[in-house]
């Protein structure tokens, strides 16, 4: 059982994904999205307003406990970590032509916006917070886990591609 104390609340409140900020590769993606991509004229400032729950909130604590209780299915997670492959498989399953160039363009154009938002909020990954709450998570780290956790890039890009493909 975890007990909130003044000391651990102060420690938990300070946890961020990174103290280092964005590297050059990520900065180039942000610049591409702002200046060249499909969304170059898209003003996403309104998405910079809504903060995620505080690290010390019961919402975060309950979410971490929920994640801890989920069965680990590494094969499923790895299979669905590749957004392009997921949509390609859905198209194959439904005998539809997979629009590879369009999907590639959507992913490339949205990546910088997502990265910019992620580093604006600098939200720690769940495993970074879990240790402060004495919660044990698996040690498997995916390639997609090398940015702050909020907002979810997989969710944004999955919804974006799904909405475009349904039209």
Where is each model-derived feature located?
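Hydrophobic alpha-helical bundle signature of multipass membrane enzymes
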Residues: 4-167
């Amino acid at each position: 059982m975890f007990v909130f104390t003044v000391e651990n609340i102060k420690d938990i409140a300070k946890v961020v994904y990174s103290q280092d900020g964005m590297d050059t590769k990520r900065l180039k993606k942000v610049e591409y999205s702002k200046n060249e991509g499909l969304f170059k004229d898209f003003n996403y400032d309104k998405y910079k307003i809504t903060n995620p729950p505080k690290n010390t909130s019961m919402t975060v604590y309950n979410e971490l406990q929920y994640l801890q209780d989920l069965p680990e299915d590494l094969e499923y997670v790895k299979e669905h970590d590749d957004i392009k492959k997921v949509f390609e498989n859905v198209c194959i399953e439904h005998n539809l032509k997979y629009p590879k160039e369009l999907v590639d363009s959507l992913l490339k154009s949205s990546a910088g916006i997502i990265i910019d938002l992620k580093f604006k909020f600098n939200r720690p990954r769940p495993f970074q917070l879990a240790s402060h709450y004495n919660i044990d998570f698996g040690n498997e780290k995916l390639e997609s886990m090398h940015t702050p956790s909020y907002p979810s890039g997989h969710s944004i890009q999955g919804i974006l591609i799904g909405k475009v493909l349904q039209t």
